[in-house]
Amino acid sequence: DIMLAGAVSGSDPMFVNMGFSIFQAYPENNIHAPFDKNSQGLFAGEGAGMMVLKRHSDAVRDGDKIHAIIKGGALSNDGKGEFVLSPNTKGQVLVYERAYADADVDPRDVDYIECHATGTPKGDKVELGSMETFFSRYNNKPLLGSVKSNLGHLLTAAGMPGMTKAIWALNEGKIPATINLNDPIVSKQDYLGAEQMLTDTVDWPSSNLNKPKTAGVSVFGFGGSNAHLVLQAPSQKLETDFSTAKAREPLAIIGMDAHFGRADNLASVQQLFNQNENTFTELPKLRWRGIENNTKVMNALALNKAPKGSYVESFDIDFLRFKVPPNEQDCLIPQQLMMMKVADNAAKDAGLKEGSNVAVLVAMGIELELHQYRGRVNLSTQIEESLLQQGVKLTQEQRQTLTNIAKDSVAFAAQLNQYTSFIGNIMASRISALWDFSGPAITLSAEENSVYRCAELAENLFQTSDIDAVIIAAVDLAGSVENITLRQHYGKVNIDASPASSLLDENTWRVGEGAAAFVVKPQSKVEEQQVYATINGISFASGTDQHVTSNATASAIKKAANNALAIAGVNAESITCVEAHGSGFLHENAAEQQALPALYSGKPISSVKSNVGHLFNASGVASIVKAALMLDAKSNAKPSYVAINGLGRDESCAHLILSSSQQRHQTAAAPIVKKRPQLIKTINLGGNSITDLIIQKGQIAELTDIKKAFSSQTLVEVSHPITLKNIQPKAVAQHNVPLSNTTAVIGAQVKNNQQGLVKGVSSAKTSTDVSTKTSKEIYQASATHQAFLTTRQTAQQQISQ
């Protein structure tokens, strides 16, 4: 009945500025002005926004203040293009077509477009050309603007300021200026140009008073991910003719692939499950880069040794197939490469066709090894401060040599392809580009329930659009030292990967990592022999309250399970077996122990984590793959059912009901294509020991004089050593505290200052005065520009080293 929809952008400025410097997206001439000929790039911004959404009829009924009406919208992907950072007219025009068809709005009636327009020369020209191509068909020249001229590029929240500006304009009947626009660009055929670009605030066009004011808002993301929203002015008049969403259908799983630990393909994964084996091994030699031998770090982690786990040591990939450079120092990170491999194989298994309207949904979390780059950058100041405290005097060249040895031993200097692969949403777009898919490409992060949320989103896409299929992929290389450092705060890791006497009695978690993908279509669109299993019902429930306990979570499990069973149209007695979350975290296991046996009395309960460990963001896909393979083996006239339970760090519960089909799955016949060349290389996770690399480089001649400078000094403990306190795991007794009841302080701390807050609120204006002059419309302090420039220059200096 009501929904909160919001966005936030507040990433570490060091990573943001480093990234855009590598992408050469910052203006060399320090001019950032969307749609201006002299603009050479963008400025990054930060911020957040939130909107409350209701059905139009409900809002009118309840007497709510309506700010605007969302008539419709659409998503698309560029598919095959030049490069993941380069926009493509094909995908942008397609999203306009889909959006106005979805909104049932005539493009002739569009008054204003709030553009994506970032200020980058190529991006602005491509977007202007896309609008020319689309709107010239309808002989319409809408007014154009970009809020990025005021606020910069808010990255993950880029659409929120644009929507806010468009909604404000619809309400006020005035369109704000795009500031700093002095020399406007024009579209290729001169259809759109200066006349449409507002340099002053103007009244809303009044060419047709009988039609509602209409605006479009565009957002175009890295990787060719496109979105367009159609907004109209608030109205109390209700629509009498509108389409309804298609009826929900069960989702048939028609293609799969997986790589968990040493089980590197679907056949080996199936054998693993059939024989009830596991993939637990000792830590591979290169995985932690020798950190497991650092006593201080291991003591801080409360580990006497690296835990056994389902580690991925290496995997092979065809670089020519995926069109990525095989440069060791500028290669995509393993997280993206592994996801691409399993998603590609799943698409082949399903027999998908290139160029189809297929959506790609990827469940993932940030690759925590990214922090190695922060460590690399921090070494510059850490070494400088240490030398100063020790009284060691080195020449500038010697300091640089010493610093470079330390930095290169941690990580190579960031380069374009590698740094690009840390951007999560590009992960899905790479598959769309490989297969030339035009459907939405979305990454979704909801921790352990990420895959289940992808399945829910797939249901929604099938009901509200005309997509042909959805690829759902997930990856989590959760065996890195960074991941284990983080997750030790939630619960104790199982050092020996040893099982407890009972699954739900376990109080430690096993390390697991890997990736998997599956393809779904509506059940009515597939033949029986194509199907591994069918997702008949999916439901979510939240166990979060003021004091989360296993009882609250158990109640959420029961609620989600009963809803899922009702959606699937079966009862609990029909369930053959239960796939539990079985994480090894205390309160999660306690909740399942309380709820699942009561729900499914006498049914066998197991968890894939006994075979492959806890894959966190990819844990859901492991459960689905296991259940689908088991159900495929049980294919017969009478269906078998499996219930899957999932629990997330946000205390939400997911519950799925899967069923078997009447026939065993048959892999789609491979199309006959011309044999192409291959370039298969092995990707090793981890690398050489950091300490060993430093020692090896310590033998070079340039260090002789540096060593003498140290040997002549009596070295003392540095006054501000790097602290290891923050990585120390909490006591086990504290591990049942959910994320929702904890507060993380990152960067600057927020002080409680009620007096200042009240003063700030009382002095704030409750309305905005609109002036016709740009200088009075929006003020952007020169100090803000200077801050951007200073940060950018600092980042450029750091990455050049």
What are these regions (language model features)?
Residues 1-678, 682-685:
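Condensing-enzyme catalytic core of the thiolase-fold
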Residues 199, 217, 230-231, 253-254, ...:
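Flexible, low-complexity linker/boundary loops enriched in proline and small hydrophobic residues
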